[in-house]
């Protein structure tokens, strides 16, 4: 619901908990609900072009189309003026992304923790894809982690698109996580998210993405070569089931690449609760 900028009338703004390309994220409190939320405030004056404006308008529009899901961040309120846009969202406290978690864990996660997060990410993507929504920027920075509950939430739908039974096009996303069909400029569907999620899972297990380079062009070339490897130094203690799922998600042949539902039915995902920490 978009309204005139009455944010301060309904929420008490507290401390800054994050900063993005277009603005800040602040913890805020609602006297009406007695709960804390996250408020993303965007300064429209820093928007450079139509693409920037489309990006900030896309997130609330797409998320309004999605029924609530436990692994997708929720939007509760929207306030707008000529110069500002404020989005009041569900708060994960303390705020931590999978990227932050990787750093705090020393660079990589145990197989059991990785599998737990992977299952929740795939559940969120399956929900999006059933609604014909493609996220297009699945990466560690866009998955929030609640260390107390072990829950994760997919966030930042600024690059998302509703397919409406069609395909999408355009190079969107973050180089390390972009699917090869996107790099090649082809039309694509929701399976680009599966490739990206596979790269996120690989990164959690190995501490680095499978395709690297010093520049975006170098990374894209590595992606197009598509040589998925599991170095023993990084994957020596990782189960064969985990590596099998990664091969089926980080698969250049889109027709053979798993869907989110396929991945959730894989044996590695079915046995999440039985995996031991390593």
From Swiss-Prot:
Which keywords are on file for this protein?
A: ATP-binding, Kinase, Nucleotide-binding, Pyruvate, Serine/threonine-protein kinase, Transferase
Q: Which GO terms describe its molecular function?
A: ATP binding; protein serine kinase activity; protein serine/threonine kinase activity
At the top of the EC hierarchy, this enzyme's class is transferase
User: Alphabetically, which GO biological process terms does the record hold?
Assistant: cellular response to phosphate starvation; protein phosphorylation; response to cycloheximide; response to light stimulus
What residues does ATP bind to? 17-25, 40
Protein kinase domain residues: 11-269
Q: What is its EC number?
A: 2.7.11.1
Where in the sequence is the active site?
A: 137
Domain of life of the source: Eukaryota
InterPro entries per UniProt: CDPK_Ser/Thr_kinases, Kinase-like_dom_sf, Prot_kinase_dom, Protein_kinase_ATP_BS, Ser/Thr_kinase_AS
Instruction: Name the job this protein performs.
Output: Calcium-independent kinase involved in light-dependent phosphoenolpyruvate carboxylase phosphorylation.
Question: What does the further note read?
Answer: Lacks the autoinhibitory region and EF hands found in calcium-dependent protein kinases.
| Protein name, UniProt field | Phosphoenolpyruvate carboxylase kinase 2
- Organism of origin is Arabidopsis thaliana (Mouse-ear cress)
Q: Which gene encodes it?
A: PPCK2
């Amino acid at each position: 619901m978009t309204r005139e900028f009455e944010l301060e009338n309904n929420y008490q703004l507290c401390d800054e908990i994050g900063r993005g390309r277009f603005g800040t994220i602040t913890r805020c409190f609602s006297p009406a609900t007695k709960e804390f939320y996250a408020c993303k405030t965007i300064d429209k004056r820093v928007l450079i072009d139509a693409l920037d404006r489309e990006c900030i308008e896309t997130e609330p529009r797409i998320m309004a189309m999605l029924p609530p899901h436990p692994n997708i961040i929720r939007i509760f309120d929207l306030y707008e003026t000529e110069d500002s846009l404020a989005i009041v969202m569900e708060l994960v406290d303390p705020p931590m992304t999978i990227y932050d978690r990787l750093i705090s864990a020393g660079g990589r996660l145990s197989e059991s923790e990785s599998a737990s997060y992977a299952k929740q990410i795939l559940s969120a993507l399956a929900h999006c894809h059933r609604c014909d929504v493609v996220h297009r920027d699945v990466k560690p920075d866009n998955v929030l982690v609640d260390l107390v509950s072990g829950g994760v939430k997919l966030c930042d739908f600024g690059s998302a698109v509703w397919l409406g039974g069609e395909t999408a096009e355009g190079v969107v996303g973050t180089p390390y996580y972009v699917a090869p069909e996107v790099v090649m400029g082809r039309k694509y569907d929701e399976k680009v998210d599966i490739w990206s999620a596979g790269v996120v899972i690989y990164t959690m297990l190995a501490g680095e993405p499978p395709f690297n380079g010093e520049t975006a062009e170098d990374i894209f070339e590595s992606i197009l070569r598509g040589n998925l490897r599991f170095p023993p130094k990084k994957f020596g203690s990782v189960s064969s089931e985990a590596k099998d799922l990664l091969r089926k998600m980080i698969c250049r042949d889109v027709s053979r690449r798993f869907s989110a539902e396929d991945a959730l039915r894989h044996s590695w995902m079915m046995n999440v609760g039985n995996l031991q920490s390593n």
